[in-house]
């Protein structure tokens, strides 16, 4: 394996990133889909193979879709386990054997998500990943294969919607982090996502990590300039925990979920709908088209 121009040398996994993704559109009535995926834990004995395959098949056929990776794509070492492995003085042949197995596993996983190529906003690093002997992580290797941005530990992604036949442009800002916290209740889990808004201004806030799948919405009053003067509008803000594909409870099979008596998760992902719209206002009997905007909705 060689470093790509995009990834460069050894990139610290704890970096914060800023990036832009261009999404073209033809009609202001067509809905675009932002589909986060993460906490897949491919190769874990309790990875839900069938559900993951069904989701990939569904996502492959979804028109005008974009994807963003939320971390923990494969069942690799945790931070503590990686420190333990690094403390062992392995032979070069053992290191190569581990690297070869890791690359093979990454290639297998890439074959399942290769249909996303060209439509991926980027991949976040999680806390489960493999680090090759040259310093590259398994997530960076996937980014190289997909030709997408490595998002590091957290970051901003601005989605620019550009009309194919005019100069009309709109934007959505997404603030993402693999996740922190392990609240047992849905409210506490989603509160952690909402707290992201205390340090960053965005339209959409996303976290994974705790395997929960939940959505929250809020509205904020903002002033905008228009042809008819200053306008008051409500800005939607979306908060989401993005789900998982790892089963927690299976008869006669051990898991940390069973050991800790954690709640089972509703497997799968959230689906975010982004629809370009134009608002018209009336003044003195005439209608004016005010600034275009993106309408945000989400489903489980």
Model region roles, listed by residue range:
Residues 85-93, 246, 260-266, 271-300:
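C-terminal accessory extensions appended to soluble enzyme cores
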Residues 38-44, 161-163, 178-181, 243:
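Short, flexible loop/turn elements at secondary-structure junctions
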Residues 69, 170-278:
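Conserved beta-sheet core of the metallophosphoesterase superfamily
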Residues 4, 21-22, 28-32, 37, ...:
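Core catalytic region of metal-dependent phosphoesterases/phosphodiesterases
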Residues 1-21:
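Short glycine- and acidic-rich boundary segments immediately preceding or forming the N-terminal edge
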Residues 20-35, 158-174, 234-237:
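Beta-strand-turn-beta hairpins that frame and shape the catalytic cleft
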Residues 11-14, 148-152, 262-266:
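A short catalytic or substrate-binding loop motif that flags glycine-/basic-rich loops and adjacent residues
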């Amino acid at each position: 394996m060689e470093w790509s121009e995009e990834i460069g040398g050894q990139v610290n996994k704890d970096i914060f990133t800023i990036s832009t993704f261009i999404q073209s559109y033809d009609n202001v009535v067509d809905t675009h889909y932002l589909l986060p995926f993460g906490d897949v834990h491919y190769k874990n004995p309790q990875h839900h193979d069938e559900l993951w395959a069904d989701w990939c098949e569904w996502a492959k056929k979804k028109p005008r879709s974009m994807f963003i990776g939320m971390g923990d794509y494969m069942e690799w070492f945790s931070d503590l386990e990686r420190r333990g492995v690094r403390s062992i003085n392995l032979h070069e042949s053992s290191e190569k054997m581990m690297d070869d197995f890791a690359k093979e596993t990454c290639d297998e996983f890439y074959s399942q998500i290769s249909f996303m190529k060209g439509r991926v906003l980027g991949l976040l690093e999680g806390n489960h990943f493999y680090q090759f002997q040259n310093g590259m992580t398994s997530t960076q290797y996937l980014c190289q294969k997909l030709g997408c941005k490595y998002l590091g530990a957290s970051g901003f992604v601005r989605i620019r919607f550009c009309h194919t036949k005019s100069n009309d442009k709109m934007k959505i800002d997404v603030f993402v982090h693999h996740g922190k916290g392990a609240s047992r209740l849905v409210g506490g889990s989603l509160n952690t996502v909402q707290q992201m808004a205390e340090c960053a201004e965005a339209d959409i806030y996303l976290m994974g990590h705790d395997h929960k799948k939940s959505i929250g919405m809020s509205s904020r009053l903002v002033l905008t300039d228009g042809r008819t003067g200053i306008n008051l509008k409500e800005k939607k803000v979306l908060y989401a925990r993005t789900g998982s594909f790892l089963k927690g409870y299976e008869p006669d099979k051990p898991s940390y979920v069973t050991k800790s008596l954690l709640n089972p998760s509703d497997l799968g992902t959230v689906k975010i709908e982004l629809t370009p719209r134009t608002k018209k206002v009336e003044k003195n009997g005439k209608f004016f088209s005010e600034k275009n905007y993106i309408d945000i909705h989400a489903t489980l």
